[in-house]
Amino acid sequence: MGNGITKNPCFSGDPYAAAVASDPLPDDSHGHSFTYVPSSAAAFDHSPRSAAASSETSYFSLSGAAISANPATSASMPSFRLYNELTWPPSTACTFESSRSFAAAPLIQAAPPRLSMSGPLHATSGRFSEASGSASTASDRFSDHPFMDGMLDRASSASSTARLMPSFSHLMSEPRVAQSGLSNERSLIRSLVRVASKLRFGVPLSGRRSNGPAEPTTKSDGDYRSTPKGNVEWAQGMAGEDRFHVAVSEEHGWVFVGIYDGFNGPDATDYLFANLYVAVHRELKGVLWDDIQGVDVVTDNLPDPALANATHLCFLDAGGVGGGGDDDPDAERKAKRGRIERNADDDGASSVHRDVLKALARALARTEEAFFAAAEERAAQSPELGLVGSCVLVMLMKGKDVYLMNVGDSRAVLARRREPDFKDIFFRPDQDLQLLKAEVMRELEAHDRNGLQCVQLTPEHSAAAEEEVRRIRSQHLTDRQAVVNGRVKGKLSVTRAFGAGYLKQPKWNDRLLEAFKVDYIGAEPYISCTPSLRHHRISSNDRFLVLSSDGLYQYFTNKEVVDQVAMFTAEQPDGDPAKHLVGELVLRAARKAGMDCRRLLEIPHGDRRNYHDDVSIIVMSFEGRIWRSSV
């Protein structure tokens, strides 16, 4: 697998050079996995003022993997199709490219026989290390993984036949070549701005409806924190109809992750890939990139540690923000007043967190507005553009603050170590000392046995959620078929999505062929692009965060995902937990179909969608309060 290094703006002589796709993955590849560990000196800190007041520093490690089930499809709009061809190699269902700080490997089917491992699991410290009590009883099947081990040597030639490395630790022990040369002087965002401008993919700026390209308002627009030499490491890929990208600035202490799970074609996901990252950056300029000083999280002195952590969780359903749709007629008024629904009675999120969440919502709303404006120009020739859509999951981490935005059924699941609960033990009157000791021991044993807790940070916008069904039916009282057979109008399982205009405006439905039309009653939208937003403050109990498209949860519960990552990383702390999850998904899909995984992987793309979906997974590890990589 190549990397397209010389073709990427981070390494080319032209700072505004368009990004070009890397060489395609090997023909026998089913997807890709990748890892990223910050340099040993990198610390994701807060503002200087807060850093001086606290010795806590955030470190993280990132693991990702994606597998495709759907074949590659062509975009409907010529400009979309051109961008698709510029970005992704033709006739490939999956591809990946990145800056050189990411270690990556294709998912290639492992050759039998596979030797079984034996012996008990032992908790081991490392990048992704936290043994879970319930996970320790799970199947020890690491050696039965359906894919080959090893990482690509990114220092080798950029051909798709680059040699496999036996261990990720070997790569990380080499000099970090990405910290030198032109990679420190170029920014991925500039290439996206440039390509978007050429292909009329611009996002209208605030207060302006634009049918043409949206150029940066200043030379610094589109560059991180207005610095001409922002050091940004990045990765991007596709798997069937899924798209994802990751951007990391160690210098300024932030991470951006976007996962876009498309349906009915690639136009919406490719548009999101080209535009949402740029739009988020523009909206956050002056809010986060300029790093407003001296703003700390409001925390009350609460007696219960679990409750104290809950005060760092704030939730805002962004109706009316940035001109988007509305679930609640009072939502815009509430948003203007800055009201935030919290998990505990607290003073509310600080203004900076509220502003970041609003900025994310505005970026998404304006990106969808621009998407429909561009699609409108080709609606007569390509009415099927009214069908295409995508789920959206965005994570932005700045220091210890994690901001999440989701539309659809992709998930962000947090793994957290629960604190032992002694409050019902120590405060009993006339407690016998021996009995007290016994109950303390039982609580500690239960704590170890229960292992990690899983917390789903993003709500699910699908017809499986009763509150979403009630919302849609309340908005369409005269339509008894608003939600039928677990789908909106019998067509779409998600209740919120980017695009999918045929369920938002009657005109898009009217343009479709009769076979694709729905019985659109009235003028109100059936689905919306109103995102759910959440801010979470990383605590000493938080271990890792799993971001993924919904295909992962076709075969896993939230708890099973957390336990699988914990079990795998306890045994293989230098391993790739996201790749392990993909391998376990293939094993479960094959078992359900009554076949072995080799036979499943031989099924062509398209037909394989009957067994599993496209899946994109990002696992981020925060090893406690102060976490350092083992490098």
Swiss-Prot record:
Mn(2+) 1 binds at D261, G262. GO terms for molecular function: metal ion binding; protein serine/threonine phosphatase activity. Its cofactor is Mg(2+); Mn(2+). The keyword Oxidoreductase does not apply. GO terms for biological process: signal transduction. Pfam families: PP2C (PF00481). Mn(2+) 2 binds at D261, D550, D613. InterPro entries: PP2C (IPR015655), PPM-type-like_dom_sf (IPR036457), PPM-type_phosphatase-like_dom (IPR001932). Residues 119-142, 205-231, 324-347 are annotated as: Disordered. Transmembrane segments: none annotated. Keywords: Hydrolase, Magnesium, Manganese, Metal-binding, Protein phosphatase. It catalyses: O-phospho-L-seryl-[protein] + H2O = L-seryl-[protein] + phosphate; O-phospho-L-threonyl-[protein] + H2O = L-threonyl-[protein] + phosphate. Residues 221-622 form the PPM-type phosphatase domain. It is an enzyme of class 3 (hydrolase). Binds 2 magnesium or manganese ions per subunit. The keyword Nucleotide-binding does not apply. SUPFAM superfamilies: PP2C-like. It comes from the Eukaryota. Its EC number is 3.1.3.16. Residues 131-140 have a biased composition (Polar residues). Belongs to the PP2C family. PANTHER family: PROTEIN PHOSPHATASE 2C, PROTEIN PHOSPHATASE 2C 31-RELATED. This is Probable protein phosphatase 2C 31.
